[in-house]
Swiss-Prot record:
Molecular function (Gene Ontology), one example: structural constituent of ribosome
Residue ranges the record marks as coiled coil: none
Gene Ontology CC annotations of this record: ribonucleoprotein complex; ribosome
Keywords, comma-separated and alphabetical: Ribonucleoprotein, Ribosomal protein, RNA-binding, rRNA-binding
One of the Pfam families matching this protein, by short name: Ribosomal_L23
PANTHER family per record: 60S RIBOSOMAL PROTEIN L23A (PTHR11620)
Family listed: Belongs to the universal ribosomal protein uL23 family.
Cited function: One of the early assembly proteins it binds 23S rRNA. One of the proteins that surrounds the polypeptide exit tunnel on the outside of the ribosome. Forms the main docking site for trigger factor binding to the ribosome.
Biological processes, Gene Ontology terms: translation
Source organism (scientific name): Baumannia cicadellinicola subsp. Homalodisca coagulata
Keyword Iron: no
Name this protein carries in UniProt: Large ribosomal subunit protein uL23
Oligomeric and partner information: Part of the 50S ribosomal subunit. Contacts protein L29, and trigger factor when it is bound to the ribosome.
Gene3D superfamilies: 3.30.70.330
């Protein structure tokens, strides 16, 4: 039970941008925001159990948070981890069912 809860916390959200949309259409790759402490093995296990697709390889990147200003005040966004997940041929993955 504890292991299942950990798997649910590994994947945070899909990362949607122009670059990721192009990569997803051109190649069989998913781009997800994941927990900063998650390992490649944990990400692979979570994808396998939650979405039931086979993972070929995973590349991870830690994205540095930006400095933001609001008037004189300076704030910082936190760092986060992005995972590029390559699926085997024939494996299809849709985050939103019924999307047109």
């Amino acid at each position: 039970m504890i292991y299942d809860n950990r798997l649910l916390k590994v994947i945070c959200a899909p990362h949607v941008s122009e670059k990721t949309s192009a990569v997803m259409e051109k190649n069989n790759i998913l781009v997800l925001k994941v927990d900063k402490k998650a390992t490649k093995a944990a990400i692979k296990q979570a994808i396998l159990q939650l979405f039931e697709v086979k993972v070929k390889e995973i590349h991870t990147i830690i994205v540095k948070g930006k400095t933001k200003r609001h008037g004189k005040r300076i704030g910082f966004r936190s760092n986060w981890k992005k995972a590029y997940i390559t699926l085997y041929e024939g494996q299809n993955f849709t985050l939103i069912n019924g999307a047109k």
